[in-house]
Regions:
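Short catalytic/ligand-binding loop motif for oxyanion handling, primarily in non-cytosolic enzymes
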Residues: 14, 50-54, 97-100, 125-127, ...
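Hydrophobic/aromatic residues located in beta-strands of well-ordered beta-sheets
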Residues: 41-43, 115, 145, 178
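Residues that mark the start of a beta-strand
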Residues: 1-5, 114, 211-213
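Short hydrophobic "strand-cap" motifs at the C-terminus of beta-strands
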Residues: 118, 148, 216-220
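Conserved catalytic-core segment of nucleotide-activated headgroup transferases in glycan assembly
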Residues: 186-229
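Extended catalytic core of nucleotide-activated donor transferases of GT-like folds
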Residues: 25, 48-138
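N-terminal subdomain of nucleotide-sugar transferases
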Residues: 1-58, 62
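A short, active-site helix/loop in glycosyltransferases that binds the activated sugar's phosphate group
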Residues: 99, 129-200
Length: 229
């Protein structure tokens, strides 16, 4: 241990319909608690009981097994920021509370810790308004948004550049830096298929051995997820 205290405003472990964001967030949190680099993990969420139930099903993960996961109500956040020298806060996406948390940190925290997040969908119309809130004097050079691809990083940089120009923002105002952090694949959950398994899969779909196949990873929705079309 010895890595300080990790904080977040988001549960990362969510039920309901299966979306890519939820799968990625669950994978991140399970991997983090398996590696277990921090002394404690503080969650400030709107439904503490639901998150406690989710963690009860993962009590074999090292970070959870040793009791390092601490779950609080969002209402406890201000007092915790005043009293706790957090190592960092990491959020499950950049459009749900990152600028607001930075403002609270700057006002209350005894130590100015970095705040990070990672992008998921970036195509919704209201996202420009949400990203506008990221450009202000309270951002520090250690605050960051993880982009899951070079393309995502380019889009996010374009958002910020367009907002600066369109609103004539002060060039001295920072925005979170962009770091390209590709999504990982758990080799145990998705092992490389054997030649026999690959041939069987092709046969299942009536594909010849040398026939090219394009596999689309993602969710297809008529209203907001037809990028491939």
């Amino acid at each position: 241990m010895g890595g300080g205290i990790f904080g977040t405003l988001h549960p990362f472990l969510e039920g309901g319909a299966v979306y890519g964001r939820k799968v990625a967030n669950t994978g991140f949190m399970e991997a983090l608690l398996r590696l277990d680099p921090f002394d404690e993990y503080h969650f400030f969420v709107t439904d503490p009981d639901a998150l406690r139930t989710a963690f009860a099903a993962r009590d074999t993960l090292p970070g959870a097994a040793r009791g390092a996961v601490k779950i609080f109500s969002r209402q406890d956040l201000a007092d915790a920021l005043r009293a706790t020298p957090y190592h960092c806060f990491h959020l499950s996406d950049p459009v749900s509370g990152q600028p607001e948390l930075a403002a609270l940190r700057n006002a209350l925290a005894p130590r100015i810790f970095p705040i990070t997040s990672v992008n998921h969908s970036i195509s919704y119309l209201d996202y420009a308004q949400r990203f506008l809130a990221h450009i202000w004097p309270g951002v520090t050079v250690r605050d960051a948004i993880g982009a899951t691809s070079r393309a995502a990083s380019k889009v996010l940089a374009g958002y910020f550049a367009q907002l600066r120009e369109g609103y004539s923002l002060n060039p001295a105002w920072l925005r979170p830096r962009l770091e390209i952090i590709p999504l990982g694949v758990d080799p145990e959950a998705f092992p490389e298929p054997t030649p026999e398994a690959r041939r069987a899969a092709r046969a299942r779909f009536g594909l010849a051995d040398g026939e090219a196949v394009c596999l689309l990873h993602g969710r297809i929705s008529l209203d907001d997820k037809l990028d491939a079309m």
